[in-house]
Amino acid sequence: MIVVTGAAGFIGSNLVKQLNAMGRNDIIAVDDLTDGTQMFNLADCEIADYLDKDDFIKQIKAGDFDNKLEVIFHQGACSSTTEWDGKFMMANNFEYSKTLLHYSQANNCQFIYASSASVYGGSEKFIEQRELEKPLNVYAYSKFLFDQYVRQQKLTGQVAGLRYFNVYGPREQHKGGMASVAFHFNNQINTNGVCRLFEGVDGYENGQQLRDFVFVEDVVKVNLWLWQNPSVSGIYNCGTGQAQSFNDVANAVIAYHGKGHIEYIPFPDKLKGAYQSYTQADLTQLRAAGYQGEFKTVEQAVPEYLDWLKTQHFIGQ
């Protein structure tokens, strides 16, 4: 039996869909469906059962799943970088993850979890080393703290964390303001033909802030590779290894539609000092672990994503 936490979320639902494509339907989907619109992410997927995240963790603690799970893909978390309720974030992200880690180690269950590139904060290098980890918000701190906790454990089975960079693609629509710029730029072009980007900051020209934008399909492939290689444990960056600008994303959306232009807006004061103007995954450790898959560029993946978006109709749109 396979567990995917955050199964109705962005990366989790893409994982479930790909597991289905591999012939695996024996999946327990774990999530919090307070936002009922997230059910659309699972509506075309095959699962064996659904459990609320609180019920699942109670059953884990009660021993209901002892020696019954093959792998846990732990994608569930509060992923808002603007959430500052530290007590909530620690309980939801850090403590929950610790419980699943200890269960996995005690029950010979592979544990593959979502970390985040946000742990690097304002660092200019993105290598899986403690001295480069400088979280700028409580979400990033919760992810950083769990990575640190994992590093201190004497592991008996596979534990692999993936530091996701800027993931974009199908099934992210429920994230609202936290959805990718590709999603928002597409909506903006459809609404009034204008992509709105931040003006320059931190020495970058308008729209030239750089991020490692990685397609969700490629992120799923790394997760599945780890599952298929249970001897691989560690914390790994998960991005393309090549930063691209926000202008690149906007231009890919404009090129797809054959219309539109870019408009630059003032950089918000509230984000100053808490914003990553540059991220680029160093993939040295992931490659050394044996992963050989390629990652799509913005120019390759954005048209695929927009093709998918054209086929969708979301509640409220």
UniProtKB/Swiss-Prot annotation:
Q: Which cofactor(s) does the record list? A: NADP(+)
Q: Name one GO biological process term.
A: ADP-L-glycero-beta-D-manno-heptose biosynthetic process
The protein's Enzyme Commission number: 5.1.3.20
- Biochemical pathway: Nucleotide-sugar biosynthesis; ADP-L-glycero-beta-D-manno-heptose biosynthesis; ADP-L-glycero-beta-D-manno-heptose from D-glycero-beta-D-manno-heptose 7-phosphate: step 4/4
| UniProt cross-references to Pfam families, sorted A to Z | Epimerase
- Which amino acid positions bind substrate, per UniProt? N166, G177, H184, F198, E199, G200, V201, R211, Y275
In terms of domain of life, where is this protein from? Bacteria
List, from the UniProt record, the residues annotated as the active site of this protein: Y139, K175
Q: Which stretches are transmembrane?
A: none
Q: Which HAMAP family match?
A: Heptose_epimerase
The record ties this protein, via PANTHER family, to: ADP-L-GLYCERO-D-MANNO-HEPTOSE-6-EPIMERASE (PTHR43103:SF3), NUCLEOSIDE-DIPHOSPHATE-SUGAR EPIMERASE (PTHR43103)
About its domains, the entry says: Contains a large N-terminal NADP-binding domain, and a smaller C-terminal substrate-binding domain.
Protein task: Catalyzes the interconversion between ADP-D-glycero-beta-D-manno-heptose and ADP-L-glycero-beta-D-manno-heptose via an epimerization at carbon 6 of the heptose.
Name of the protein:
ADP-L-glycero-D-manno-heptose-6-epimerase
The gene name reads: hldD
